[in-house]
């Protein structure tokens, strides 16, 4: 996924950022959101 697809038309992030890392977006999975940098996971 290209970097520009993370942002909406206003230039703001469409996805949530990691609460641990702060500078990493969480990957969207069917049943969870996951940070690939630190391993943080939020279950839906």
Swiss-Prot record:
GO terms for molecular function: structural constituent of ribosome; zinc ion binding. Keywords: Metal-binding, Ribonucleoprotein, Ribosomal protein, Zinc, Zinc-finger. InterPro entries: Ribosomal_eS31, Ribosomal_eS31_arc, Ribosomal_zn-bd. A zinc finger (C4-type) spans 18-38. Transmembrane segments: none annotated. One of its GO terms (biological process) is translation. Binds 1 zinc ion per subunit. Its cofactor is Zn(2+). SMART domains: Ribosomal_S27. Pfam families: Ribosomal_S27 (PF01599). The keyword Ribosomal protein applies. Zn(2+) binds at residues 18, 21, 35, 38. The keyword Membrane does not apply. Coiled coil: none annotated. One of its GO terms (cellular component) is ribonucleoprotein complex. HAMAP family: Ribosomal_eS31 (MF_00777). Part of the 30S ribosomal subunit. Belongs to the eukaryotic ribosomal protein eS31 family. NCBIfam families: PRK00432.1 (NF001669). This is Small ribosomal subunit protein eS31.
